[in-house]
Amino acid sequence: MGGIFGVVSKKSCTLDVFFGVDYHSHLGTKRGGMAVYGPRGFSRAIHNIENTPFRTKFDGDLDELEGTSGIGCISDNEPQPLLIQSHLGSFAITTVGKINNQDDLIRSAYENGHIHFMEMSGGRINSTELVAALINQKASITEGLQYAQERIDGSMTILILTPEGIYAARDRMGRTPIVIG
């Protein structure tokens, strides 16, 4: 399981993201992360929260995470949000869900071109990185989000933070809800 949270504001959003992600702590027990966009560009922090609460781990990061838009997550799996640089520009991405056909998508990515993935412990590929790779196969983030949702067998809800704002995409079956407002 996991939970994701995002904020776009006219003022600093750091505390809103901090407390919004902390509120989701009951949804995951292994990793927590936050990414914000501000005057200095993207800033990110990811911590292991297996033995220490989210608030305790991230309290010291708040001064470095200054911006007016941000996303964060609690995850039982991979570390995230990830910072991506591609032909679509720079963005941060976080996901919650399960990709049932992950091995097939990875194999297809290797067969179709020049791509690599960072390997995690145990030889696993970060599913959030795989989603970013799918998105990056298209000409825009919106086209990429649609393409990723079409290719994924399973459930994947996604937040993407760009310098312009946040893209939110609920999984196509509605298993993992997303609230905007």
Where are these regions (language model features)?
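Conserved short alpha-helical segments that host acidic/polar catalytic motifs at enzyme active sites
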Residues: 1-181
